Amino acid sequence: MKNRSFLLALGAGLALSGCISFGAKPPPFLLRLTPAQEGAAGAARSAAAGQAITVAIPIVGQELMTPRVPVHSGANQVAYLKDAQWVEMPSALFARLVSETISVRTGRVVLDPRQFALDPGIRLTGTLRDFGLDGDRMEAVVVYDAALARGGDRVETRRFAARSPLAAMDGASAASALNQAANQVAAEVAAWIG
């Protein structure tokens, strides 16, 4: 009797396992951002107190709180690109790209927000307003509203935006075009910080 109950339960479990799916099928590959220039291995930097820059992960709207790539169509429609997904949230990828670009282009010491206690000098924060595709114009679009706090007495803000042509509406083309636009914005942010 016990064997029969066990076999019946096992058979039911196997039958159900073919019906249950624990998540969507992953895309064939994941997307990431790469800096146009990378710092040399072993390069040492130092900064006087208050001169290190901390780059915070930007604030994003609900549309970008996913590793998927948004595609805008018309004035009010958003869909997500099929089979395209970032390795992590685009806001974190963008923050690291900006950090690396500032470090390479300015020679400044750039800290991760978790290192903020080491030197709470200059702080770059902001909102990543757009980081996706314009389906009507076949372009990648990056819009970043930056805020730079230099010490406790002054804050500067500036909007940075870049567009890059999109060869095709697929993951590889999206990654390439968004990488190009993000690098352009990161270079402009680095020039602004100086």
Over which residues does each language-model region extend?
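C-terminal motif of bacterial Sec signal peptides marking the signal peptidase cleavage site
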Residues: 15-18
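A structural "domain/chain start" motif
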Residues: 20-87, 120
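Surface-exposed short loop/turn segments
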Residues: 20-36, 100, 104-152
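Soluble periplasmic/extracytoplasmic beta-strand elements of cell-envelope proteins
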Residues: 52-58, 70-72, 123-127, 141-147, ...
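Short secondary-structure boundary motifs at beta->alpha junctions and helix caps
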Residues: 76-85, 152-187, 191
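Bacterial N-terminal signal peptides that target proteins for export
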Residues: 1-8
